[in-house]
Amino acid sequence: MTPSQWDLPVELCCRPMAFVTLTGLDVVYNAVHRAVWDAFCANRRADRVPISFKVLPGDHEYPKCRTKRTSYEWYIPKGILKTGWMNKHLNLVPALVVVFYELDWDEPQWKEKQSECATRVEIVRQSLQGRNTKVAVVLIQKKTPLPPGEDVIASERAAALCNACDLSGKSLFVLPHTDHLVGYIIRLENAFYEHAQTYYYTEIRRVKSHKEFLNKTTHQLLFVRHQFKIAFFSELKQDTQNALKNYRTAYNLVHELRAHETNMLEIKTMAGFINYKICRLCFQHNTPLDAIAQFRKHIDLCKKKIGSAELAFEHAAWMSKQFQAFGDLFDEAIKLGLTAIQTQNPGFYYQQAAYYAQERKQLASMLCNHDSSVVYPNPDPLETQTGVLDFYGQRPWRQGTLSFDLSDPEKEKMGILSLQLKERNVLHSELIITLLSNAVAQFKKYKCPRMKSHLMVQMGEEYYFAKDYAKALKLLDYVMCEYRSEGWWTLLTSILTTALKCSYLMAQIKDYITYSLELLGRASTLKDDQKSRIEKNLIKVLMNESPDPEPDCDAAAVKASQKLWSDRVSLAGSNVFTIEVQDFIPFVQCKAKFLAPSFHVDVPVQFDIYLRADCPHPIRFSKLCISFNNQDYNQYCVVEEAYQKSDILEQSSQGTMCLVPGKTRKFTFKFVAKTEDVGKKIEITSVDLILGSESGRCVILNWRGGGGDAASSQEALQAARSFRRRPKLPDNEVHWDSLAIQASTMIISRVPNISVQLRHEPPALTNEMYCLVVTIESHEETVAKDVKLTAGLKPGQDANLTQKTQVTLRGTDTCDDSFPALLPDIPVGDLQPGEKLEKPIYIRCGTVGARMFLVYVSYLINTTVEGKEILCKCHRDETVTIETVFPFDVAIKFVSTKLEHLDRVFADIPFLLMTDILSASPWPLTIVTSQLQLSASMTSVDQLESYVENVVLQTGESASECFCLRCPPVTNSGGVATGCYIISWKRSSPVESVPVVSTVITLPHVIVESIPLHVKADLPSFGRVRESLPVRYHLQNKTNLVQDVEVSMEPSDAFMFSGLKQIRLRILPGTQQEVLYNFYPLMAGYQQLPSLHINLLRFPNFTNQLLRRFIPTHIFVKPQGRQADENSIAAA
């Protein structure tokens, strides 16, 4: 039997489809026939009926039909299912044979053509030899047929043709060869499908009829066979629900069969076939849980049915194939839309398949381990006359034998031997690797990283057993990183051991050294004697010698590798290996630590390198060197020691570069930083520890940064969380876990020895030239050279502050937006020891709020460090926050001549502009002057003068001004610009040079309206009781029209009056009329005047309410005074 016997048959795994053969088509030489065939087969869409087509000649011989049994009473079956039965009904025995014939209804030679067609049909029937296969005829015609019933000739000839061919009307079809060929073909397919359905239905009934004659005593195998056939025919009929039902019945019947070593393989084979079908249909019906449940049941029922103990590897192979097949089904269902999860995906089944393949390998190594003198039996017990088995699952040397007793034990023994010898040639590792690879792909897809890593390790080990060491090393190397990062030290040690063997057998020197370094380290769980052996081998490699073989390696592979190692020794190639230890865990640990996070440039930079070895024996290194981001410092940080090659493994702890296991060794370095590195970070980019010498092989252990390896971060975290008290060590020793890596330090400038003081009077006032006095005093012992001052707004603040802040050195300057916010590098000169100087800075702040100002003083000075003179740049900076406030608030309002608030003014009517300046400054303010600048649309009634000139305002005090203005008529209806109000002010200070600040306040716009009539009243400021009070009213026409005015006077209780009580006037455009009244006050006090009422006939909207804005309504009346006579004076 061949190894492929465990593969499921192709006819079992494919989707069963109705088989239809097409005859009468010449697809090679006839273009019409070729077009018909392509329409049937090419580019079939998923929605077309499931039919398998095949073109055969008309006289093709189909498989012969055996004579049917009339009784099963004495019939004893020889097996369950014949190996060719499924293929026969899928590809050999058609459900329908279609005869294609070119014949039109108007064919002149109709009789001859009809007879020829009938002959072809009869030949097909003869070749089917009594099978139930349906026969149909398709007439290929050139013309499109008329609708049914309209072509009488066609109907008559169709009936005649059916009669001649012995066909029903449903079995005769017409295929016009037109542009719509595909559409006709699809309709033909549907008709063919119905005929095929009928055929398979008939076959199912035929098989069921046989079951009536069976008994369970001698026909147990037939029960299974018939039930399988019914299910298979149901699948061909596309009745998958009934197919699943019958497959389940067949599966139960299989397990009811009596099992013995002789028929165990046949039972398992058929159980596997039927289980595959059940699971496939469950996935097809979208019931994956039923498929999984069926498969678990199948495995539980079959895993104990091992069969012959001498062929136990066959059971493992069969179990492996069951899991692999189910995994394939599961994966196929996922590709068709099924959703899987992490805990239930095909990977688990591929993994189990791989485990059984590994078990098969182990059993084969035990059972097939025959002596080389054992030869393969002759004749071959596995050969058959036909080259294939008659029944699935039977032994070739006893086919059809149902007896449990072996009639020929010697033949059985030879058969088992041949199977064992063939199994010995199977490449088990390839099978295992393929299955593991499938499982890895699934676990990667469903994001199961640990399962993926676990299986990759097994793949690597399997490659190792298959002697493909390069692939093994590649896989193991990939997985090591994950186990290192998670701290699985035992697993890591096992993987490293296998990797070391691979690198040894391939004579890969660098890999061998790398894995040896890690197996000697603290992460390795090897025993000390194993570590000692590895350490000695490592030293041999470094001395350019061949290492001793690794234990448990294949003898032939070891012999080949020793030759490779000898070749490596003799080659005069590069013997320097640089190993980046950041990604693994070597036996030497390294930590670099600067003594401080920053150093002044005039102080030597100092740092320590701590080394610790974890190998079994003391080991001597040849060189230690440190690299920095500035390579100029590398030359100062090197330790080197020469020794003989034989002294690498040093038993004593003497020597500068000798590391004793478990002891921490410290190396101290110092150097003077360069002045150009001030403000920069000095970083240790790498630490190189060199093992070996140039005369042998040299290994450079390279730590990136300040040391640490793949386990350092995890160990540091554990140490930080640990509450365990550390034992006390001698003064010159430290706890390794307590050391923290400090791989960088800052070089900062020398500490300045000058003082900077700032003097000012906060807060600052908006737009004033605020004075900030900077006082610099030197306390240096030598001259401070090239002193420079930078002053202004500190960078990094709001951009709006930068735009609204200006700095200058001269207070008399008028700052605008062109002045900077920061004055850099103002030269001051040299400062002698103890010398002091002052520098005033003037700042203009255009907006309120807090600002941070920077004063930065830098200078150069000579100093000596470690006997080396350097020029240091020192600096001192001071910051101060200055609050800016408004100096005053200005209130602007418009009022009438009666001092009433105006929300709008009237053209050519005088009104008042009132300003009120309220001091908000904590310091006294001097208002130097004020100025009103009117716009072109506004005029002044009188001379504009400042009434607040040289007024000093304390906090909270205010100063007011009043201006009488007039606005000419305007054309637009919007607001009119008034102008601006300019206040010139400064802080009140005895210093005359305090600059004056001009603050411009834009006056609000006013709405100007025109009125048709303006009324002005001339009357005294007060009246007296019973004294005449003359009042004159001026009525001025403000329009271009003649105004008809009705004037009336409404009396008051406090006055009598003389004049016209009611009058009608006509006022010409631009002119005025006067109306004169004499009022006679009757009582003292603030009395209401008689009311003047005006009615404009052309402007009915002109109201008296508007009139009252222009004329007074009340007047103060004094009491009547006594006349001074002599008597009264005397009495007084």
Swiss-Prot record:
It is found in: Golgi apparatus; Golgi apparatus, cis-Golgi network. One of its GO terms (biological process) is vesicle-mediated transport. InterPro entries: TPC11, TRAPPC11_C. Pfam families: Foie-gras_1, Gryzun-like. GO terms for cellular component: Golgi apparatus. Keywords: ER-Golgi transport, Golgi apparatus, Transport. Belongs to the TRAPPC11 family. Involved in endoplasmic reticulum to Golgi apparatus trafficking at a very early stage. Component of the multisubunit TRAPP (transport protein particle) complex. PANTHER family: FOIE GRAS, TRAFFICKING PROTEIN PARTICLE COMPLEX SUBUNIT 11. This is Trafficking protein particle complex subunit 11. It comes from Gallus gallus (Chicken). The gene is TRAPPC11.
